[in-house]
Amino acid sequence: IGMETGGDQDPFNSTLERTAREIHENYQKSSPKAPSWERLSEFKRNSNRHAVLHVEIKRAVWRKQGTRTKEEILGHLTRSEHMRWMAFNTMDGWRYAPIEEQDPDHRLHPCLRPFNELNMHDKRKDAENVFHALELPIETSIPEIADSSLER
């Protein structure tokens, strides 16, 4: 799933690339074995680029909290982030496989399943993506949020 932009001189392209790199660098903080941006496949780079396009949606939802609590909104956005990620991958032919059968060459990934079936580590990755998109500090309460509002 490619991203066509107007080339290196296009301001959208440079902002998109810079922010996609930032998203990946944020991911590397919780997954130190993740490769550098330069070593990512084009598919993984495009995954980060598509995540950038969803940032404004997350921010709009965050601004319009209404009567819902911060934890409820963060839970909703975290579940939505996981669904966005799953949609991107399944549209490219990826399928679920247990962790012991994970195989990028055959497009098999253990996180391609409903959010409530993920372990806390994988839920936290989705929550950290949301916190990063909203420019909120990564809070130590992410597991608490996950326990209370992400299980619905």
PLM feature spans:
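Alpha-helical propensity feature that highlights long, continuous alpha-helices across diverse contexts
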Residues: 1-152
